[in-house]
Amino acid sequence: MASDVRVRFAPSPTGKLHIGGARTAIYNWAFARANGGTFILRIDDTDPTRSTDENAQIILRAMRWLGLDWDEGPEVGGDFGPYAQTERLDLYKQAAQKLWDEGKAYPCFCTKEQLDADRKAAQERKDPFQGYQRRCRDLDPEEARRRIEAGESYVLRIKVPEDRGDVVIHDAVHGEVT
């Protein structure tokens, strides 16, 4: 019987495989094998200034040296490719657009400098910084589209309901966590 277990290791090809990455790969591989699952290798090549194909090949060789094989990924393919993050950008853009279209996400135009200033002001007031202040959450969608079309930089943020109360998840190790 096939297992539903699917685990992924996504090293960044910005250098050689380091000990922490090797440990994570070994744990994921062992978990997949122990549960009859699938071990997926996906290359996280999203740092264009430091990622290289040569480093990706070095990582693949290191994983083979460790005795690790992968069921899906570079050189072996699979049903859920591509297996390099930069080749998946269209998939991510489609998913992000869907979230925005459904009202589950919104564009934020706050600059790094604005966010740093918010953090610094909270520190000066000795207030605990509560993170992003949702400044762009309720922007008119047409204004947001105009700003995007004008080439203004933005990120897409998840539109978490404001009246959600505590978010509680079940963690397999820690139980209920808020």
Regions found by a protein language model. Give the residues of each.
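Active-site cores that bind ATP or allylic diphosphates and position pyrophosphate for catalysis
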Residues: 106-107, 111-178
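N-terminal Rossmann-like or analogous alpha/beta NTP/dinucleotide-binding catalytic cores
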Residues: 1-124
